[in-house]
C-alpha cells in the first residue's frame, strides 16, 4: 500500500523550493514510501508501561580532575608570531572601524 504519491512528492518539492526531475520524483516517492512504512511499523509497537525519556543517558556534568601539563611560556608562544603588541598576537583587523 503506497502511503505517498508522486504528486505529493512534487508538492513537497515545490514547498521546499527543490527542482526535481521526473526520475527524481519517482525515486523519492519510493524512498519516502519506504520511510513512512518503517515509521508506521515503529508506531505500531506496544509501549505500554515504558517510561518516556528524552535521553537514556543521565550523565550530567561529568568532570575530570584538573591536571597541570607543561606548556609554552608567553615568550615562546610569541617567538614565531609575525607580529606582537603588548605581549599579545597582533592580527589584521577584520571587523568594524579602527580606533
Curated annotation (Swiss-Prot):
UniProt keyword Protease present: no
Enzyme superclass (EC): ligase
EC number of this enzyme: 6.3.5.-
Example GO biological process: glutaminyl-tRNAGln biosynthesis via transamidation
Domain of life where this protein originates: Bacteria
Catalytic reaction equation(s): L-glutamyl-tRNA(Gln) + L-glutamine + ATP + H2O = L-glutaminyl-tRNA(Gln) + L-glutamate + ADP + phosphate + H(+); L-aspartyl-tRNA(Asn) + L-glutamine + ATP + H2O = L-asparaginyl-tRNA(Asn) + L-glutamate + ADP + phosphate + 2 H(+)
NCBIfam families assigned to the protein according to its UniProt record, in alphabetical order: gatC
PANTHER family: GLUTAMYL-TRNA(GLN) AMIDOTRANSFERASE SUBUNIT C, MITOCHONDRIAL (PTHR15004:SF0)
Record-stated family: Belongs to the GatC family.
Record function comment: Allows the formation of correctly charged Asn-tRNA(Asn) or Gln-tRNA(Gln) through the transamidation of misacylated Asp-tRNA(Asn) or Glu-tRNA(Gln) in organisms which lack either or both of asparaginyl-tRNA or glutaminyl-tRNA synthetases. The reaction takes place in the presence of glutamine and ATP through an activated phospho-Asp-tRNA(Asn) or phospho-Glu-tRNA(Gln).
Self-association and partners: Heterotrimer of A, B and C subunits.
Name of the protein in its database record: Aspartyl/glutamyl-tRNA(Asn/Gln) amidotransferase subunit C
Native source organism of the sequence: Mycobacterium marinum (strain ATCC BAA-535 / M)
This protein's encoding gene: gatC
Amino acid at each position: 500500500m503506497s502511503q505517498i504519491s508522486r504528486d505529493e512528492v512534487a508538492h513537497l518539492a515545490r514547498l521546499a523550493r527543490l527542482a526535481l526531475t521526473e526520475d527524481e520524483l519517482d525515486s523519492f516517492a519510493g524512498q519516502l514510501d519506504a520511510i513512512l512504512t518503517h515509521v508506521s511499523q515503529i508506531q505500531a509497537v506496544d509501549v505500554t508501561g515504558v517510561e518516556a525519556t528524552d535521553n537514556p543517558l543521565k550523565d550530567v556534568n561529568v568532570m575530570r580532575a584538573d591536571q597541570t601539563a607543561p606548556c609554552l611560556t608567553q615568550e615562546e608562544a610569541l617567538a614565531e608570531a609575525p607580529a606582537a603588541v603588548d605581549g599579545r598576537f597582533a592580527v589584521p583587523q577584520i571587523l568594524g572601524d579602527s580606533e
